Amino acid sequence: GLLLDNSSSYGVWSSYSGGAAIWHIKDIHSSCYGYNDCVAQSPKLVDLEEANDGDLDNALSNGRTTHLFYSGNSATFDNSSTPNSKLYDNSFSGISATSISAAGDNMTLTISK
């Protein structure tokens, strides 16, 4: 499944200008009992879909604003975007988030399936 949230520049996101965070959530129950068991899961149980590249997955970054979706960075998340909304088995989910607005406390986007 997918989870979308507006990560405005408050709290843990206070050092970023904000944007839409899109999280890929593994649908099936997993038995991970310790931190290392959960971190080593493949595919990940919860994974931030990075709007610009995969450097979080490669441990090259601790996070930055361009990992979030917003107009002026990456404003489309669908089956053919990079990253894409395909399921873990690479089949089409049919889910898309498009026309993502500029980052801010209030953001708009179009979600379709």
Positions of PLM-derived features:
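Non-catalytic C-terminal accessory/binding modules of secreted extracellular proteins
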Residues: 1-113
